Design a protein with these regions (language model features):
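Core SAM-dependent methyltransferase catalytic element
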Residues: 124-143
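Short strand-turn motif at the edge of the Rossmann-like AdoMet-binding core
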Residues: 79, 103-108
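A short glycine-rich, Lys/Arg-flanked "PGG" loop and its adjoining helix->strand segment in the class I
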Residues: 85-100
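Conserved SAM/SAH cofactor-binding pocket of Class I
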Residues: 1-68
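Hydrophobic beta-strand segment of the Class I
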Residues: 12, 75-77
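Short alpha-helix
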Residues: 106-121
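Conserved short alpha-helix immediately C-terminal to the canonical SAM/SAH-binding motif I
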Residues: 42-46, 83, 110
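Conserved helix-to-beta-strand junction in the class I
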Residues: 5, 93-95, 104, 121
Length: 143
């Protein structure tokens, strides 16, 4: 999904970054800038080390989506379905008009919870990507 939907030289965000792998991939696929945050202090250093090991520059810090004052062309969020639904408004606020977001880490049976939030915030569903019992949703912010 990163390779397919992220514009070249995109400004990208990885929300709930964990190990930082999605942000690191975005950087390797040509993002000009990658910001990643997580609310778990223990993962920040791990993510920074992973970026270093992969020779990419990413800004990783302790933060939450509601406190970020930047806009991004491409947003990645691999978080539990209920958290995705709860913070969908904050995630939308991070997106530039026409920007894409990949919502992943969703169990198939929990997909309706996330889709309801996508509809509630008027995001356009572009594609569903399935892998076994997991689903990723690609959405776009329409002006």
């Amino acid at each position: 999904a990163i390779e397919k939907y992220m514009p070249k030289n995109a400004k990208a965000a990885d929300i709930g970054m964990g190990s930082g792998i999605l942000g690191i991939c975005a950087k390797k696929f040509g993002a000009s800038y990658v910001y990643g945050c997580d609310n778990d202090e223990t993962v920040i250093e791990v993510a920074k080390e992973n970026a270093l090991k992969n020779n990419v520059e990413c800004l990783f810090e302790l933060n939450t989506a509601d406190k970020i004052n930047e806009k991004f062309d491409f947003v990645l969020a691999n978080i539990l379905h209920n958290v995705l639904a709860d913070i969908m408004g904050d995630l939308k606020n991070l997106m530039n008009d026409g920007g894409y977001m990949v919502l992943s880490g969703i169990l198939d049976e929990k997909k309706p919870v996330v889709l309801d939030a996508v509809k509630k915030y008027s995001l356009e569903l572009i594609e569903e990507v399935r892998q076994e019992q997991w689903v990723a949703l690609i959405v776009r912010k329409v002006d």
